Swiss-Prot record:
Pfam families: PapZ_C, RapZ-like_N. Displays ATPase and GTPase activities. This is Nucleotide-binding protein M6_Spy0559. GTP binds at D63, M64, R65, S66. One of its GO terms (molecular function) is ATP binding. Belongs to the RapZ-like family. Keywords: ATP-binding, GTP-binding, Nucleotide-binding. The keyword Nucleotide-binding applies. It comes from the Bacteria. ATP binds at G13, M14, S15, G16, A17, G18, K19, T20.
Amino acid sequence: MSDKHINLVIVTGMSGAGKTVAIQSFEDLGYFTIDNMPPALVPKFLELIEQTNENRRVALVVDMRSRLFFKEINSTLDSIESNPSIDFRILFLDATDGELVSRYKETRRSHPLAADGRVLDGIRLERELLSPLKSMSQHVVDTTKLTPRQLRKTISDQFSEGSNQASLRIEVMSFGFKYGLPLDADLVFDVRFLPNPYYQVELREKTGLDEDVFNYVMSHPESEVFYKHLLNLIVPILPAYQKEGKSVLTVAIGCTGGQHRSVAFAHCLAESLATDWSVNESHRDQNRRKETVNRS
């Protein structure tokens, strides 16, 4: 086996306490996640992870939905603990009986251990069965008074790697207004007021990623002023988006055709933000004109 470490979080706890929100939060933090994992399959799954170069941060939901399989949880945890290449923690989500009953009434779902349909009986049985696991958990979170957003923030605070990159990803994209606004954009900026390289014959067939086009776009005084204001607007508000629990922020910059000005600006912005944040850069329409010409 590889000597590289796996960072494993076992997510467990009371049914209705927020495990679905929790596992989604781990996925947003960049973890490889699996919901409702039978305990007996965990060691074999971790062996497969060790043999690959895939994501070594893993979060698995293991709970009473496994029913009969759950009795193997102790032997599974012993196996994990004996493996020096695995660092693991247990996150236990809890809530008061009254709050859990209220949540089940609201969703109209049945409790996995309520054989006769009485939710409170199922909750009490589950609490008794999970008591030993709760006592060995490194993290116990009471979600009784927490909103989903607050739970996501709690998980981010406790399990992110301590950087902005772990909890907010920024998608910087360019586009052409003539092809429509991006439906998933959170912030949209229009750079059609800038001089257009399209009217420079030697630049027309190139894109904003080509050095001469990039320099043409960014060297104009209007570009310098606008870019400065753009950074001054975006950078201070990123922590606020992060605090609100947003995992992906899409910043879209548009020009007429999405080939020159918006591409150059998006590329420049992505490089600036990437010094402190996790950034993905994309250019939706930069080749759209060429593809249209080739099809005609």
